[in-house]
Curated annotation (Swiss-Prot):
Gene Ontology terms for molecular function: 5S rRNA binding; structural constituent of ribosome
UniProt-recorded name of the protein: Large ribosomal subunit protein bL25
Entries under InterPro entries matching the protein: Rbsml_bL25/Gln-tRNA_synth_N (IPR020056), Ribosomal_bL25/Gln-tRNA_synth (IPR011035), Ribosomal_bL25_short (IPR020055), Ribosomal_L25_dom (IPR029751), Ribosomal_uL5_bac-type (IPR020930)
Species name: Shewanella woodyi (strain ATCC 51908 / MS32)
Gene Ontology CC, one term: cytosolic large ribosomal subunit
Subunit structure: Part of the 50S ribosomal subunit; part of the 5S rRNA/L5/L18/L25 subcomplex. Contacts the 5S rRNA. Binds to the 5S rRNA independently of L5 and L18.
One GO biological process term: translation
């Protein structure tokens, strides 16, 4: 199955800005990989909460629509809230 997530590049980085994003129902994330610069991104929580329940989400290649260009990535790590059904941060690697 193919998954697509719309995202924007983050300009503010740090604990305070990440908390503000989470309170606004956004998920901070990063895309990294060998030979490429890491890119801090943000996307809506509703875009990922439902698709991450599928088993093939973690093993398939995702498409992130990043400010008009498509980037192929795979999920490396996902941080979740301790007891709420919230995703706090996602690490993606270039596919």
């Amino acid at each position: 199955m193919s998954y697509t997530i719309a995202a924007q590049v983050r300009t503010e980085i740090g604990k305070g800005s990440s908390r503000r994003l989470r309170h606004a129902d956004k998920v901070p994330a990063v895309i990294y990989g060998p030979g490429k610069e890491p890119v801090a991104i943000v996307f809506d929580h509703k875009d990922i909460i439902n698709i991450q329940e599928n088993e093939d989400f973690y093993t398939s290649t995702l498409t992130i629509n990043l400010d008009g260009s498509d980037v192929k990535v795979s999920v490396k790590a996902m941080q979740r809230h301790a007891f709420k059904p919230l995703i706090e941060h996602v690490d993606f690697t270039y596919a």
